[in-house]
């Protein structure tokens, strides 16, 4: 429900009503405190797709992955006086090896397509698609981070941004490929996502 409320801010972000969007995110945070994590990205994801701000977000993600041990020590120190003070020790105690790399790759598909087909996005000049691309970049960055830290804790955060992929991916298919290619790709994706769904069920012992 918290993720749905944050996603409902989309029309407000497009109309640049950031105050109202902030209030809704704060409301979502009363349902789940992690919704506050989405607040800075209200401002970071403004502007054209793949702009400097979103690229600057990816830089610290890469640095964290390269220096993961130092990052976890700093994170543990920062969370010491909060309700999340045991997060780092918990994911180490649970032997949490991070988000499965296949899951990271699957959720990164819309982001990768947006980079490959950036000229189509630039030509369309649609603020909604620009927003969706930037949210998708954030989602992918956090998923990459979760692959090297915690799938249980960090791996849950992308839900606030990955919902935009449900707008972005269909747009990419219909604007970047020919009609015949779209049909073939749609069938292939249905098969692959079905496989991915059952793979997820099996991974969690539900199948």
Specify the residue positions occupied by each region the protein language model found.
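Juxtamembrane boundary at the C-terminal end of a transmembrane helix
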Residues: 198-207
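Alpha-helical transmembrane segments and terminal signal-anchor/GPI-anchor hydrophobic tails
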Residues: 45-157
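Membrane-interface alpha helices of multi-pass inner-membrane proteins
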Residues: 9-10, 20-44
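Signature aromatic-anchored transmembrane alpha helix within multi-pass, membrane-resident enzymes
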Residues: 59-60, 178-198
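Membrane-interface junctions at the ends of membrane-embedded or membrane-associated helices
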Residues: 15-19, 171-185
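Membrane-interface transmembrane helices that cradle and orient dolichyl/undecaprenyl
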Residues: 1, 6-19
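Hydrophobic/aromatic-rich transmembrane helices and adjacent perimembrane loops
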Residues: 153-171
């Amino acid at each position: 429900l918290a993720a749905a409320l944050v996603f409902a801010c989309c029309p407000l972000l497009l109309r640049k009503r950031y105050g109202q969007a902030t209030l809704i995110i704060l409301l979502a945070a009363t349902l789940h405190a992690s919704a506050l994590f989405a607040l800075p990205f209200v401002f970071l994801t403004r502007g054209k797709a793949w702009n400097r701000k979103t690229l600057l977000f990816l830089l610290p993600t890469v640095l964290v992955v390269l220096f993961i041990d130092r990052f976890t020590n700093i994170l543990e120190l920062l969370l010491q006086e909060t309700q999340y003070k045991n997060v780092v020790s918990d994911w180490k105690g649970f032997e949490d090896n991070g988000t499965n790399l296949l899951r990271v790759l699957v959720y990164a598909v819309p982001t990768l397509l947006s980079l490959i087909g950036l000229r189509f996005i630039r030509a369309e000049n649609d603020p909604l698609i620009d927003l969706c691309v930037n949210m998708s970049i954030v989602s992918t960055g956090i998923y990459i981070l979760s692959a090297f830290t915690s799938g249980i804790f960090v791996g849950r955060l992308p839900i606030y941004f990955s919902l935009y992929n449900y707008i972005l991916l269909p747009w990419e298919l219909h604007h970047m490929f020919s009609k015949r290619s779209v049909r073939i790709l749609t069938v292939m994706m249905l098969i692959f996502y079905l496989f991915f769904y059952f793979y997820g069920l099996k991974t969690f012992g539900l199948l």
